[in-house]
Structures are given as structure tokens and as C-alpha cells.
Regions:
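Membrane-interface helix caps and helix-loop-helix hairpins in membrane proteins
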Residues: 38-42, 91-100, 216-217, 383-388
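Transmembrane signal-anchor hairpin modules in multi-pass inner-membrane enzymes, especially those
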Residues: 1-87, 121-131, 193-202, 248-252, ...
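Hydrophobic alpha-helical transmembrane segments
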Residues: 342-354
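Long extracytoplasmic/lumenal interhelical loops at the membrane interface
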Residues: 265-286, 294, 298-341, 363
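Juxtamembrane membrane-water interface segments that cap and precede transmembrane helices
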Residues: 32-38, 158-171, 320-335
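Loop-to-helix entry and N-terminal half of a specific, functionally important transmembrane alpha helix
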Residues: 22-27, 328, 332, 359-384, ...
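Alpha-helical transmembrane segments of multi-pass inner-membrane proteins
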Residues: 5-11, 80-91, 107-112, 127-164, ...
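Membrane-interface micro-motifs in multi-pass membrane enzymes
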Residues: 1, 41-50, 101-105, 170-184, ...
Length: 432
């Protein structure tokens, strides 16, 4: 109760300027998932509550003021169409309860994406957004190191059924999704290490190494592969001397190689020891392929893949029965889309990702590297993860779309004003 006045003042500040006061803490808490619970349920964590506050404040601002973005990126109607199709799937879903529960999460992410893109951003607030995302990644890796060194070790898996030794992120988003959540912060930090100078370069270089360490701590092979993609794109598109790019590339390769060879504190051990093990993904994908003739055309309903898996597992003798039970995620957003919302849903989702990639590619050279690197890295990780309902996936889509609107606004301000049609300026008469 003593904090009620401060909390009330903060809420008022968020409604007055949501980009400045609500967005940064929300972005920082994204990699922590629902760790800090206030209420039970999918939206009971502090991160989700901040997301609801941010979304409400942005929507009220959009209703009461002029839209900040004069241009709506094509990604917005595409993802709204995906949401609409997922919502309509409730009418034919084989698991309507699961569809309704998952649809709430998807809708909250898409609505927040739309509100962010329609809000007034400039280069300063875009940098604040990116810095907050990077700070969240650094903070969660620091949290993991504290768990390992001061709190008796990593606590193990809480996000779902599982076995094996504990991995960093098991109690947050799940280890593999935790690695994917660090890709956007890694892209921002690595790009700034490449392009900035002095103390800023040193700070962002340290953040880059810490984020890379966090990905190694998760033991995620797909996360490590995606991190390589992020680094490759940053080095390719970043504006910096070739010598600096060569030094950074060599340093990253050497550090990762040393970590995988010597495995200090066990970091990198899982990536090496399980390099040829699919961890059951191929068996799950075989079950999905078995179900495709039934559901790939119209879909089984959003969120219905676990039910499909239970139904089709006995009909897929070549798929091993996993020791963790029969309720599984598809471990690929592409398999998820085609089974749950059919071929139309898969086409819309691929179109949304393609539009985002095209938008990132068309950004000015000085802005292009972080969004492009984060998006490509996320696409690679999403081939192995069904992470479309996670906030970090939509943070990447939002970062690309907001960067597009900022670049478009900057270009419009830079263009000379053109006379209106019918209001031509007469030529000056020559002085005799």
C-alpha cells in the first residue's frame, strides 16, 4: 500500500508517454518470460501486465491524437490477416479450448505490434527501444550467472515436461527459446560494437560477449547456429572498415571454438555432445507429416497441434514414443502453421516474414544491419522452435516495422516540398 502513490504516478506517466515510460521496462523483461508472477494465468506476470499497460496506453494515444506514423508497413495487414484466420479456426478447431487460450496470446502480441507501428517514433526513441531490448538480454544472462555462482546452480525446467541436466533458461522461457530471445539483443550489441567508437564500443563489445555466453549457457544448438547467422549478417551489412570487421569476426570464431573445445563450467558441452541428436524433433515432425493429409489444407485449429500429436502418434510407427509424454509442440513455426491453420495460414505467415525481410533490406545502410540480422537469426531459430506465441518473436517483427516507419519519416522530411497541383508558382519576370 505504501507504494500505491508511486505506482499510480507511474501509470499516469505511462499513459502520457508510453514509449518513454512503458516500453523500456516491458522490453527489458521480455527474456524473463513469466518469471515474476503477480497473478495466476497467462497474463499474470509483470512482463505481461506491462505489455497490457503499454498496449492500452498506446491505443488511447492513437485514438486521442493524430497517428504518428504516416505510413503503415505492409507487414501490418499481413499479420492481421494471420490473426483473423487463426481466430476463424475456432469454428472448426478439434480442440476449441486450446484454440481460445492460444488465440488470446496471439491477439495480444499482434495488437501490440500494430499499436507500436502506428505510434510516433523517431531515431531517439527507436534507439531507446533497441537499448532496452539489449539491456534485457544482458540482465537475464547476469541473472543466470548469479543462479550458477550464488544461488546453488540452475533450478531446472519449469516451463514444461522435460528431463536431463538443468540448462540456463529452463525456468524462464525454456532453454531453446531463451537462446532465441537473445538474438535481437545480440544483433543490436554486435552492430554497435562494429559501428560506434570509444567507450561505447567497449561497452557494447562486452555486452556482445556476455550475450554470446548466455547462448552457450542455454546449450541450444539452434541458438548457436542462429547466433552465427546474426554475426554474419552484422559483419556483412555493418558500416565499418574491413580491418575492424576482420578483427571482430576472428575474435568471435576463436572464442566460440575455445568454448566448444574446453567447455569451461560446462558451457558448450551440450552443443558438442548432442551435435547429431535431434532431441526428438524428427520424430515429432514425422507425426506432423502423418497428420498432414488430414489437416494441412484447412488446419486443425490454432493451438491444436498437441491434440493432433496425441491422435496421430499411434499411427506413426517410425516415430519413437518420447519419454516426456505425448503433449508436444511442433518445434517449428512452419509445421505449426500448416497443421493448425492450414496451407493458407502457412502462406500468410511466410508472406509476413518475407515482407519483413524486404522491409529490413530496404532500410538505409546505417539502419539495416541490426533488424536484418535479428530477423534472419530468428527465422533460422524458428525452423527448430514453435515460438510464434512468444513476445521476443514479435519484438523482432516490431523492431523491423518501426525501423521502417522511422526511415520513411526521415526520408519524407529530407525531400524538398513540392507545389500542390493547381498551385503552380509563376516564373519571375526578367528585369529589364
Amino acid at each position: 500500500m505504501a507504494l500505491s502513490p508511486l505506482l499510480g504516478a507511474y501509470v499516469i506517466a505511462c499513459f502520457r508517454d508510453p514509449v518513454r515510460y512503458a516500453l523500456p521496462p516491458y522490453a527489458v523483461l521480455i527474456p524473463f518470460g513469466s518469471s515474476f508472477k503477480v497473478f495466476p494465468g497467462a497474463f499474470g506476470g509483470i512482463s505481461s501486465l506491462l505489455g497490457l499497460l503499454l498496449g492500452a496506453a498506446l491505443l488511447i494515444q492513437l485514438v486521442t491524437t493524430r497517428w504518428g506514423s504516416a505510413r503503415i508497413p505492409l507487414a501490418i495487414p499481413v499479420w492481421l490477416a494471420f490473426l483473423a484466420l487463426s481466430g476463424f479456426s475456432l469454428f472448426w478447431s478439434i480442440a476449441p479450448g486450446a484454440t481460445f487460450l492460444d488465440l488470446r496470446i496471439l491477439a495480444s502480441n499482434v495488437v501490440l505490434l500494430v499499436a507500436l507501428v502506428l505510434t510516433r517514433f523517431d531515431h531517439r526513441t527507436l534507439r531507446l527501444f533497441a537499448t532496452s531490448l539489449m539491456a534485457g538480454g544482458v540482465a537475464v544472462v547476469g541473472y543466470g550467472l548469479v543462479q550458477m555462482t550464488l544461488l546453488g546452480g540452475l533450478p531446472g525446467k519449469r516451463t514444461g515436461p522435460g528431463d536431463g541436466p538443468p540448462r540456463f533458461g529452463d525456468d524462464l522461457l525454456g532453454a531453446n527459446n531463451e537462446a532465441a530471445a537473445l538474438l535481437l539483443p545480440l544483433a543490436v550489441a554486435a552492430s554497435r560494437t562494429l559501428t560506434e567508437s570509444g567507450r561505447s564500443r567497449l561497452l557494447h563489445g562486452a555486452a556482445t560477449l556476455l550475450l554470446l555466453l548466455g547462448i552457450l549457457m542455454t546449450g541450444s544448438r539452434g541458438g548457436l547456429l542462429s547466433a552465427f547467422v546474426v554475426f554474419a549478417v552484422v559483419l556483412w551489412l555493418g558500416i565499418a572498415p574491413r580491418a575492424r570487421k576482420a578483427v571482430i569476426a576472428t575474435s568471435v570464431v576463436v572464442l566460440i571454438a575455445l568454448a566448444l573445445m574446453f567447455q569451461p563450467f560446462g558451457f558448450g558441452r551440450r552443443q558438442v555432445e548432442n551435435s547429431t541428436n535431434s532431441s526428438g524433433r524428427t520424430d515429432i515432425w514425422m507425426v506432423g507429416a502423418q497428420a498432414c493429409p488430414l489437416y494441412c489444407l484447412g488446419g486443425a485449429g490454432w493451438g491444436a497441434f498437441p491434440t493432433v500429436y496425441q491422435q496421430e502418434l499411434s499411427s506413426t510407427p517410425e516415430a519413437r514414443v518420447q519419454p516426456r509424454g505425448a503433449t508436444f509442440e511442433p518445434h517449428s513455426i512452419f509445421l505449426l502453421a500448416v497443421i493448425e491453420v492450414g496451407l493458407p495460414g502457412l502462406v500468410i505467415m511466410v508472406l509476413g516474414l518475407a515482407v519483413a525481410l524486404l522491409s529490413a533490406w530496404r532500410l538505409p545502410a546505417a539502419m539495416r544491419a541490426p533488424p536484418m540480422a535479428a530477423l534472419l537469426g530468428t527465422c533460422v531459430s524458428s525452423f527448430f522452435l514453435s515460438n510464434i506465441n512468444y513476445k521476443f518473436f514479435w519484438a523482432v517483427i516490431a523492431y523491423v516495422a518501426v525501423s521502417e516507419t522511422v526511415a520513411a519519416a526521415t526520408q519524407e522530411r529530407a525531400e524538398p516540398a513540392r507545389p500542390a497541383v493547381g498551385g503552380l508558382v509563376p516564373a519571375q519576370q526578367e528585369v529589364q
